Amino acid sequence: MEFIQHDAPLSGRIKDINLNDFIPNQTKAKIIKFVDDNLVVLIKNQFINDYKLKEFSNFFGELDPPGPNPYGINFLPEHPEINVISNVKNSNGIPIGNLGDGEATWHADMTYLKQPPKYGILYAVEVPKNQGNTHFANMYKAYEKLPNNLKKIIDDKIIIHDSSHNSAGMLRKGFKKVSRPDLTPGARHPAVITNPQNNKKRLFLGRRPNAYVLGLKINESEKLLNDIWYYATTEEITWTQNWEVGDLLIWKNLYVLHKRDAFDPNSRRIMHRTQIKGNDNLN
């Protein structure tokens, strides 16, 4: 097994591993540390079933069930811990997964919860070639790039994270459309979080739509968020995953943002995703 750090603002790759094989605890610990150090890690050429996907995911902690989707159903009744990300519909015209084929804008997963998931794991079952790429941005580097005046403003701010819409902009089942950002439903989180293990600060933004900075007028909140998001998504702090079947990607959900490109609606894309329960300290 080989650990390769990419020449990029974040990400690495693990080679010569088969997740169908028995993996000893010492190797598990090395994998977890490599993910923690590089924030996003790719493992290619994995051909595993859903049981193995859950088994591998458990390396990182307790599985966290996916959030509500617009259809209000479990896509895989035998595996409720797995979310299906897909544009495919079954013979009855019912989607077999979430998020469709459009762009999924920059976000971190489920930050509208008090305890959003710590890790995300995404496995490519079926993908169109050179489409639907996923981009990741390093929130340590985003904070580093902020001008000092913005750091002073944002350091003690709290942001409301919208729970009504998903990252594709679809209204979740049981929610109403947000009329004003300051009325947004969802958790309230610090805009800046310090990792106690390395004492480094990072931005924690969730999603841009319907976000609101507590204590500010709406126009002030909008301007501040727009300024911060400019630095959070600049190309020089990002890395892009061009998917192939059998790719498995692990990322630290609370340390990065990610987005997905749109792809041809006539193509087929099926991804299986798990996530790991977080905690109150958001680390």
Which residues are covered by each model-predicted region?
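Fe(II)/2-oxoglutarate oxygenase catalytic core
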Residues: 2-250, 254-283
